[in-house]
From Swiss-Prot:
InterPro entries: SpoVG (IPR007170), SpoVG_sf (IPR036751)
Summary of the function given for this chain in its UniProt record: Could be involved in septation.
One annotated GO biological process: division septum assembly
Protein name, UniProt field: Putative septation protein SpoVG
Gene3D superfamilies: Stage V sporulation protein G
């Protein structure tokens, strides 16, 4: 499944969450509310999730295999770096 669009909405507030992202696949299916998070080992993505009654977070949508997760994460983080660098130049 090819990623055909990545839309980044940067978060300006201080904190670990840096952006909220929408990813489109094959110009036919979109996943909203993927988060870019600054962790101890650098940036990573968190798939959209909801909080269960017992306080646990469960993914609403997520990749089934590691290769797909890595492909999605690379596309998102590459686009995030482009957007971040554009903002720094302005």
């Amino acid at each position: 499944m090819n990623i055909t669009d990545v839309r980044i909405r940067k978060i300006s507030a201080e904190g670990k969450m840096k952006a909220i992202v929408s990813v489109t696949f094959e110009n036919q299916f979109v996943v909203h509310d993927i988060k870019v998070i600054e962790g101890q080992n650098g940036l990573f993505i968190a798939m959209p999730s909801r909080k269960t009654p017992d306080g646990e977070f469960k993914d609403i949508a997520h990749p089934i295999d590691t290769q797909t997760r890595e492909q999605i994460q690379k596309a998102i983080l590459d686009e995030y770096e482009k957007v971040k660098n554009l903002d720094m130049q302005e």
